[in-house]
Amino acid sequence: KYKNEAILIDTGGKVSFKTEKWKQKTKYYITDSTIVFLKSIGITKLNTLITTHGDYDHMGEASNLINNFKVDKVVFNCGTYNDLESNLINILKVKNIDNYTCIKELSLKGHKLNFLNIKEYDNENDNSNVIYFKYNNFKFLFMGDAGITKEKNIIEKYNLSNIDVLKVGHHGSDTSTSEYFINKINPKYSIISVGKNNRYGHPKESVLNTLKNSNVYRTDKNGTVMFKIKKDKLQIETCSP
């Protein structure tokens, strides 16, 4: 949120695993948690909703959000649409909401969010929108579920160093957050979005070890983590889960 303009990256959403394996991708929970949180911090409209990619845990609440909240436009990642994304696009068409795919940058009151989209990959995770944002000399990097291959490609193409806040890729899975990548970007703070006692064992110990020189915040332990820039200072607030 900046000067009455608000951008949301991903909505969250919980996948249900209470059915046969072949049905798992078609069942998910919809809640109002995203809308409740946005209203609690004074946001009543989104200028842009960005989905990093089409997994339920990243955009499972998107349709509910669009149907019950004011959203001006939606940005999708590179690659082909899955069923969840296609359903959302149909809703956007009905509501005459603009949507864009595989963009390079987005303006926020004179500041730019850069989308580090190298190429189209053959897997959804590496097709994640990776977003770099710099404001008042503070650097933010949001990795979606991008894996080690894309991390390497990003380092080879972009001059990234001394990142202030890293949104760690793929919830702390060992398919992301390589030592090579972390040594290059040297994040001061690292945020891991992860559920308590999750079935995948995220974050992995190897990833936590790779991030040993970074200040790590985890949503399963720290709850909601908020970064605010005030008078050229970066403030951190947490709300226990």
Which stretches of residues belong to each language-model region?
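Non-globular, low-confidence helical/coil segments that flank catalytic cores
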Residues: K1-P241
